[in-house]
Amino acid sequence: LVGSEMCIRDRFNAHLENKEAIEQRQEAIRELSTDLEYRQQIRLSGLLYKGKPADTSEIKEWANSPSYYRKHRLLRMIPATVSVINLLCISLTCLDILPASIAGGVFACFVVFSSVFSKGITKLQATYGKKLQILSTYADQILLTEKKDMHSPVLQELKAELTSRNQTASQAVRRLSKLMNALDQRNNLLISMLLNGLIFWELRQVMKIEQWKEVHASDLPRWIETVGEIDAYCSLATFAYNHPEYIYPKINSHSFHMQAKALGHPLMDRNKCVRNGIDIDKRPFFIIITGANMAGKSTYLRTVGVNYLLACMGAPVWADEMEIYPARLVTSLRTNDSLTDNESYFFAELKRLKLIIDKLEAGEEHFIILDEILKGTNSMDKQ
């Protein structure tokens, strides 16, 4: 799902720096990694309709937008009034009190009158109809989570978010999905004319959708975010399941200590990867990596950075043992120049270094990885 992809991306960009939060996330990932059936069901339901990146944000925007039709009292009365008039005309016609031509004329007038609202309803259907197809996927995933017993505190909190007033979240979301799918019946011109002439069906249907929105306007964005969070946990749990030899690192919150044995890069071939250790526990807390070209210095730095990031996300790492002090990871591994911004590679690296210095001087704690900084520039210019 798009929501889960955003959650995973956010976890990479803004990883945890709190020991308790990381350990709680480790517990949640451990729990889900043992439930293969649940994760496969979540994965399968998410593949049915993944949606587009803009879908979830536009659905949230729709949920927070004011109702258009229900805010007018007169418009709210129209469907019921039309239904009563048609029922009266049909009854009088059956009793031979009213000519059928008059009843037919009234019906035709209502068909024409209903077309006044068609443009706005068509716009609503065109804008959100396809996007709300993803709601059935959310409903399926919510239902799976509602039925599952959660044990870790993090997962219990997420499950508690999937609540509503007098019905489950899955029932509420499925109700909206059915309302939007029913609105598609207006694409059948014959049925649309018949229902609009009799009960102003399109306007009635849109008002039901707006009524749902008024009740669950604050719930829907929360449910979407919660489903994305759970799906993201399932992705990390699948990563843990696929690598049973990986270990969950120890988190140290007292003083800086970065120590690991036999670190390996998760993307490298396990048969070819040369695993190395790291140990930083003494002031001034830095190490310098030197060696010949193509000796693997950059790969080593990336290995340390990737595993450190995974550790701060609560995920397992490829190591025999590992202990970290969680801090913000800052790197200068792939600095790029920019012709449009008139920035050379050298200037871009200087800006990055200035940013790091400013953060450190502000008292922020960081784990910093620099790879061949200011390379390609002679020593005099570097000074």
Each PLM stretch: what is its role?
Residues 24-85, 212:
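Membrane-interface, cytosolic juxtamembrane amphipathic helix immediately N-terminal to a transmembrane helix
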Residues 219-241:
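Interdomain "pre-motor" coupling segment immediately N-terminal to P-loop NTPase/helicase cores
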Residues 10-37, 54, 130-133, 225:
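Long, charged/polar-rich coiled-coil alpha-helical scaffolds that serve as structural arms
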Residues 114-117, 236, 242-383:
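ATPase nucleotide-binding head domains, primarily ABC-like/P-loop NTPase cores
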Residues 139, 143, 231, 354-357:
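Structural signal for well-ordered, non-membrane alpha-helices
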